[in-house]
Structure formats: structure tokens, C-alpha cells
A protein has these predicted regions:
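Serine/threonine-rich low-complexity intrinsically disordered regions
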Residues: 6-7, 122-124, 177, 204-208
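Membrane-interface helix-start motif
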Residues: 146, 198-218
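Solvent-exposed, well-ordered amphipathic alpha-helical segments
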Residues: 17, 21-23, 63, 194-202
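Broad hydrophobic/π-residue packing in well-ordered secondary structure
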Residues: 8, 18, 42, 193-195, ...
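Juxtamembrane extracytoplasmic/periplasmic/luminal helical "stalk" adjacent to the first N-terminal
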Residues: 1-34
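Intrinsically disordered, low-complexity polar/acidic regions
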Residues: 30-196
Length: 219
């Protein structure tokens, strides 16, 4: 169980590092009363190898995407979109980050969308919904360090998340090629969704020594 917790926390933190980009944009919007000047420059500085794109969606409509090239189809009305509308409205109405996916990106890669709702205050001190700051995380790139270590140490693993905030059904985000026999798991929450990380040695659980030894490398 310790080993699942150790890796599970690492994976959670790797995903959180991507989500921090939406928080950074959110703070700029709040401080600048809903405006971001030089969005492309800011987004470029926030990008990393595990990020597919950074987006702004005032009133829930995606208007700005970095990088713009190849992402023109991403400019959609999230609130009224048949695949994204319900979960986007949930994020807006419940003041919570949502993660949706994985879904196929261009070149056959996969991604997870993180939508972070932003609220501003009008002249009457009334809060209103500005829109979303968004980042598309590449899968499995966002947790590549963890899965590289897992593979090196001879583990099979599975990362999954609930399909939506109101669902108990888990959807696989990424998994190793082999089967999982009697896996131990670690559950964690990101935004409004529950995530689960499962792990088992490729050779099976012989004894507790293996768990203790491998855990020691990451404490």
C-alpha cells in the first residue's frame, strides 16, 4: 500500500503542475479585471513538453489558444457543446475545476482538458462568471517521470478517473501493457473528479520486501 501511495502522490503532483498553469492565468484575469494582454507571450512562457495547448474561454467560449497553429478547431462554445456542455456547466455552477478525457489529439496522441472557472466582481460587488482558463495535458507525457520509473522497477500500473463528477464509473486514462493481478490502489481527487492509481509487480506480490525496497527510493 505504501508503494501505491508514493507513486500515486507523484502522479497527482505531476497532474497538479499542469493545472497550476490555469491558476496562473486565473490570477492575471482577476488582477487585471478580466483582461490578459499579450496572451501568446504569457502562454508561451507557461508551456512545457507535457502541455498540448493553453486556452481562454470568456463566457465559456474558447477565443484564444496557444499555440494557435493546428488548434483552430478548438474554438468552440463549451457551455452549449453536446460533449462538453454538461461538465462545463457543472464546473461553472459549482466553482470547481473539472478534468475531461482522455480524448484523441492530432497525430494520434491523447489529452485531458482541465477547465478552471474564473469569477470576477462587478461594480456592485456582485460575483459573476467570467469564463474558463484551460490547459490540455498530454497523456502520458504529464506523468512520464512516474511511469518511466514504474517500468524500470518492473511494475504494471493503471491510472483511471471517474467519467464525470456525478459518475461512479472509472475510465482508464493510461495503463501499462501487462495485466494487473491483485493490484493495490491509491485514490485521490483532482478538482471535482476522483482518480485511482493501481499497481502490481510484473512478477506478482512475492512478499513485502519488494514494496519496502522500492518505496525507499522515492521517500
Amino acid at each position: 500500500q505504501l508503494n501505491a501511495t508514493t507513486y500515486g502522490e507523484r502522479i497527482k503532483n505531476e497532474i497538479a503542475s499542469g493545472i497550476e498553469i490555469t491558476d496562473a492565468l486565473k490570477q492575471i484575469l482577476i488582477s487585471e479585471n478580466g483582461e490578459i494582454n499579450q496572451f501568446d507571450t504569457i502562454a508561451e512562457n507557461l508551456m512545457s513538453a507535457s502541455i498540448e495547448s493553453v486556452q481562454l474561454a470568456p463566457d465559456g467560449v474558447v477565443t484564444d489558444i496557444y499555440p494557435a497553429e493546428g488548434n483552430e478547431a478548438g474554438k468552440i462554445d463549451l457551455i452549449h457543446d453536446k460533449d462538453r456542455g454538461e461538465i462545463s456547466c457543472y464546473a461553472r455552477d459549482n466553482h470547481t475545476i473539472i478534468t475531461q478525457g482522455p480524448f484523441e489529439l492530432k497525430q494520434g496522441d491523447y489529452g485531458i482538458a482541465v477547465r478552471n472557472p474564473v469569477y470576477l466582481t462587478d461594480t456592485n460587488k456582485q460575483e459573476y462568471f467570467w469564463g474558463f482558463t484551460i490547459v490540455i495535458l498530454r497523456v502520458p507525457d504529464i506523468f512520464s517521470d512516474s511511469i518511466y520509473a514504474l517500468s524500470n522497477f518492473g511494475y504494471e500500473y493503471r491510472i483511471s478517473k471517474t467519467a464525470s463528477p456525478w459518475s461512479d464509473t472509472y475510465k482508464v486514462v493510461y495503463q501499462s501493457d501487462g495485466s494487473l493481478t491483485q493490484p493495490v490502489s491509491y485514490d485521490f481527487k483532482i478538482g471535482a473528479e476522483n482518480w485511482r492509481f493501481e499497481i502490481t509487480p510484473q512478477s506478482g506480490w512475492r512478499n513485502n520486501t519488494l514494496i519496502a525496497v522500492v518505496t525507499g527510493f522515492f521517500l
